[in-house]
Amino acid sequence: MAVSSENVKLLREMTGAGMLDCKKALEEANGDIDKAKEILRIKGLAKADKKASRETKEGLIVAKSTPSKGAMVELACETDFVARNGSFKELANKILDYVLENVGDTKGESRDSSILQGKIDGITIEELLKEAIAKIGENIQLKRYCVVEGPNFSYIHGGGRIGVLLSYEGDNLDVVKDVALQIAAMRPEFLSPETVPQDVIEREKAIYMEQAKKEGKPENMLEKIAEGKLKKFYEEKTLLHQKFIKDEKKTIQDYTKANNVTIKGFCRFEIGT
């Protein structure tokens, strides 16, 4: 049957599909816009599966805090152009709202793919991503997310390229903000030496001892040299042992303790890492 140009235009606005695809879908659906949308969606999902293996090095980080809970999400895509797209940002924030409302404390970043079966307005997140891939034309993936419970603070830098979410105890919000900025700038990987996994410690020590051995250091000094380098590792990689960027005479632990603030945990996301 013949379809009107108005309906083709309307379907294009609703789905983001090409004019010819919209015309064919309407003809196949005998002019029924809802059926045509479903036809396009099915075809779009097939296209989306083909794009799913393409690299996603760009994206957007979004975060939201309430007094009792905070969440952060990284939605990945292929190009910076798409990362700035309004519908991409809208999708990121939809997923963020779902995570904030439905996911408990993740105890750090999570990449658990079971979240993709969660439903937003009756449609799974997996289906929403595939629809976005079909509409926008790039691979789009939910890369990771983080949830903290209790008092929290979130900070987004560089238009969504870096995100920080931390949980804390205390009343000095200025100190908490300073710590969030520290995390964004200095890239700590762990909260404290006590939270560094044992396998990471053993790996670092082995590297340091091997380096010292190759430099011709005495065998009986290797352990001591490795311990010294491990101390430097803690100063670089653990938040509480880092030097405070606003006053390098203090560590973050010194600064927070002096102001009755306790940092309980944090997540740091950066696009491309």
Curated annotation (Swiss-Prot):
Gene Ontology cellular-component terms for this entry are:
cytoplasm
One Pfam match, given by its short name, reads: EF_TS
Intracellular or extracellular location(s): Cytoplasm
Highest taxon of source: Bacteria
Q: Which UniProt keywords apply?
A: Cytoplasm, Elongation factor, Protein biosynthesis
- Say where the protein is mainly found: cytoplasm
Q: Where is this region: Involved in Mg(2+) ion dislocation from EF-Tu?
A: 79-82
Q: Which GO terms describe its molecular function?
A: translation elongation factor activity
Show the InterPro entries listed in the entry. EF-Ts_dimer_sf, Transl_elong_EFTs/EF1B, Transl_elong_EFTs/EF1B_dimer, Transl_elong_Ts_CS, UBA-like_sf
User: Family per UniProt?
Assistant: Belongs to the EF-Ts family.
Q: What does this protein do?
A: Associates with the EF-Tu.GDP complex and induces the exchange of GDP to GTP. It remains bound to the aminoacyl-tRNA.EF-Tu.GTP complex up to the GTP hydrolysis stage on the ribosome.
The protein's name: Elongation factor Ts
Gene name per UniProt: tsf
